[in-house]
Amino acid sequence: MADVDELEDPMEEMTSYTFARFLRSPETEAFVRNLDRPPQMPAMRFVYLYCLCKQIQEFSGETGFCDFVSSLVQENDSKDGPSLKSIYWGLQEATDEQRTVLCSYVESMTRGQSENLMWDILRNGIISSSKLLSTIKNGPTKVFEPAPISTNHYFGGPVAFGLRCEDTVKDIVCKLICGDASANRQFGFMISPTDGIFGVSLDLCVNVESQGDFILFTDRSCIYEIKCRFKYLFSKSEFDPIYPSYTALYKRPCKRSFIRFINSIARPTVEYVPDGRLPSEGDYLLTQDEAWNLKDVRKRKLGPGHDLVADSLAANRGVESMLYVMTDPSENAGRIGIKDRVPVNIFINPRHNYFYQVLLQYKIVGDYVRHSGGGKPGRDCSPRVNIVTAFFRKRSPLDPATCTLGSDLLLDASVEIPVAVLVTPVVLPDSVIRKTLSTAAGSWKAYADNTFDTAPWVPSGLFADDESTP
């Protein structure tokens, strides 16, 4: 079996043991040359994970993944453990249910996301949700060479703002919107069990269950992808141009006051797109409601080459988002709750990166539901998906020192004050999912073929019109 060379610092060595390095290792290349056909995904992904976990367990004590793989291997042909060949064929013959168990082990081992070393390593050779659109457009040029994850963000910048406010939005969704529904707020890296080339990490999912260290998704599970809008962060001051429009929204929550609030900045987050026209790629929320048509902007017609956009627009145009306007803690003894609810015709932009993020989350969570017993017979195994847009203001001297969400959930003193949350359901047509994944998988395959002498083949099920792969 492929071993990682021993160095003084095993953690440092582990961080360099990527999927690309595994494919280029002499032992892997020798094993592949002795096969009667090219190795296949996702089996090769799981062989790599076995080799990686074998090294990790020496100092982590986590043996679950390797033990489960060993139970799938028919023969132990070496006193030092099973060979790559035995491991590969055991995993090649594994069922989707067994592969989902392996993926659940990986998810449980990688919680903590950017703070987890293994989470960073596993991105190598994976088309993640944030890379799906760029892979379709430009090819997976960075998939096998992902940029290192940075955790050193300027406190006053948009990335740090989003990170520190995300937990507050999770609290609002779980406690105030969903009414304490069973939820999981901490996810590791979720690799697709059916292909081994796609992977996601979720922000929040409600209606999930726990089975030991594993998360069990069900046909009632609902994904929430959270976006905290830094460009709408404002001060409670008459000199802030956003504040007057927020005041109008707070005093009279309605569609008209919300339109004014959204359009209080130069590049608003909601774009008006009439039927039959092509949206821009500028931001991720659209509307066809004429009340939002405040500027005469010419837009191209939908035409040849826009079939997927047209199908996605048709599926989402009737979506109704729900705006939750929050109470002001300075008027409620520090308590933040839901002041009012306003339904609005706002839906996701299928040309924006966030659409592709939730598409891949929907696909992979659906895989887990189907292959882990989380779906009931006769029911659709697909999860529901929402994108959450959260708006905040800076703290004011008038705000109490202690603020709570609801009556008892403390709001961290370092976090800004939430003023509104917009929940937008997302509809993902099957035809769009199939074509998107087929294009991305074909791009991954072509890049791997040109990069590695031992490139594994991608499952043919990912190719809608191509049976050239086994």
Swiss-Prot record:
UniProt keyword annotation of Nuclease present: yes
Top-level division of the source organism's lineage: Viruses
Cellular component GO terms, alphabetical: host cell cytoplasm; host cell nucleus
Transmembrane segments: none
Biological process annotations from GO: symbiont-mediated degradation of host mRNA; symbiont-mediated suppression of host antigen processing and presentation; symbiont-mediated suppression of host gene expression
Subcellular location: Host nucleus; Host cytoplasm
HAMAP family associated with the record: HSV_AN
Protein known as: Shutoff alkaline exonuclease
Organism annotation: Epstein-Barr virus (strain B95-8) (HHV-4)
